[in-house]
Amino acid sequence: MAGAVSEARFAGLSLMQLHELLEDDAQLGDMVRGMEEAQTVQLNKEMTLASNRSLAEGNLLYQPQLDAQKARLTQKYQELQVLFEAYQIKKTKLDKQSNNASLETLLALLQAEGAKIEEDTENMAEKFLDGELPLDSFIDVYQSKRKLAHMRRVKVEKLQELVLKGQRHPQAGAPPPPRVPEPSPATALPYPSLEATGLPSVVPRRIPPPPPPVPAGHVATPFAAAMGSGQVSAYPGLQCPPLPPRVGLPSQQGFSAQLVSPYPPALPQRPPPRMAPHQPGFILQ
């Protein structure tokens, strides 16, 4: 609605009037402040400021209580420091006493105090029976002392249990003395079986048998001569026939001279070519 009114207002102005309106800041400010949206924003702003002021005034009412709580917190913190220092001092004293005194000493002292309070209660009961104490004072004092006696008796029993446990634990936890191994005769360790190791069996090498003796008139083999055993293999000596006599030369017995062939050595012959096997349907020529 306000936008339509503004458009209608600006539509009736000429170009010169529009230029003058742009140059006049005061008139533009009045026009903006007169708009409904600007008035709504201003109203919300004033209401927000008023609510903030009221909240601030309400918070100021709690200022005395806040100051009192701060002072109380400071006092409690100082008391805490004092108590902590006292705790540290007492803890140090207790540690020194616990280091100096053992459980047996504490047990003896507590038993002495327990016996003393028991004796006091018995004496009080005798005085009451003799009529030296009135009933009212006897009931109050006797009840408190009997309560203290029972508490000390329970503490003595608990402390005795602790002492017994402390005596048992070191004995149970002490390691046994080391055992000195007795000397034993050195025995050869058996080798593991071949089935357990999975290795193939090794057969020892046999010694070759000696060759048979060579009778007279036989020739020794080169193997026997290389072994140097003095034993030769039995190979019979070769009996070669005598060579035929040549014309004009005397005949000779045995192998006095090396036989020389009058013919040149034969050349090595090439082996014949291999023929393909006979196959049906082909004629070989």
Swiss-Prot record:
GO CC, one annotated term: late endosome membrane
A GO biological-process term: catabolic process
UniProt feature, compositional bias: Polar residues: 250-259
Membrane topology designation: Peripheral membrane protein
GO molecular function annotations of the record: calcium-dependent protein binding
Segments of skewed composition (Low complexity): 276-285
Region (Interaction with IST1): 50-170
Limits of the VPS37 C-terminal domain: 84-173
Protein's recorded name: Vacuolar protein sorting-associated protein 37B
Gene: Vps37b
